[in-house]
């Protein structure tokens, strides 16, 4: 009741990545390049999989879903950040902030579980190839992807509902480059205890469960790879798995650094740097990592270019 007589915040000011004017233009150009690369890479991957009939398999169904998620949550964050680099007052309304928060959380949680689903798919393909078509049927894959999005949007709804209960009074400067949970909680003039408990609980679930699934899958995959008699075959398999595992490690490592710590000890500036990895760097790298050494993707690209040449 004490908050009813105080003026409520109707808009926030986003401080951005840095307050140094001389860095605004270089950072704008850098992140514009990253975003364009992200859009082209992920959109290109989705279109390529849709147009290539031999890529209509569970593995590429998951990969196209991952590309869609990367495209969505980088688009939720980066365009607004780019605008903020070239404007003097970086304002976002309360409603826009909560909307950005909701969709960002939804797609980040979805990515966590999508990576786990992809790791499980690779485990079945390598360790149980004879049962692959039965285990990873179209119906099973559809249910898995539906479950991934379901967990993402339900988790986001819980976080956003908790944030809507928080009262913001005078302070409205978000020390971040987008509307995220910790920076918003720092501005609250009401208790955020429930938010902190929910954040730590859901973060632990959405980071640890997929991480354990991925680790378990890769352990069995590595055991299978070690049984390959060909040295060249083992090297190719290890190099592919290591690149996949590196991308997953960067994503989950930066998420864990940001969210798996008490609110009281969270570092503001280090949090910004950590956020850059999972909001901009990983979505840009994923299309390259999952397709660079992929023979099927290269074959699909060659066929697509040959069709274009033939029609010309």
Swiss-Prot record:
PANTHER family, alphabetized: OLFACTORY RECEPTOR
Glycosylated sites: 5
Disulphide-bonded residues: 97-189
Extracellular side: 1-28, 78-99, 165-204, 266-274
GO MF, one annotated term: olfactory receptor activity
Source organism, top-level taxon: Eukaryota
Pfam families to which the protein is assigned, alphabetical: 7tm_4 (PF13853)
Major subcellular site: membrane
Gene Ontology biological-process annotations: G protein-coupled receptor signaling pathway; sensory perception of smell
Transmembrane segments: 29-49, 57-77, 100-120, 144-164, 205-225, 245-265, 275-292
Any one GO CC term of the record: plasma membrane
Assigned protein family: Belongs to the G-protein coupled receptor 1 family.
Lineage of source species: Eukaryota, Metazoa, Chordata, Craniata, Vertebrata
Lipid bilayer topology: Multi-pass membrane protein
Subcellular location: Cell membrane
Cytoplasmic side: 50-56, 121-143, 226-244, 293-312
Protein name stated in the entry: Olfactory receptor 8G50
Function: Odorant receptor.
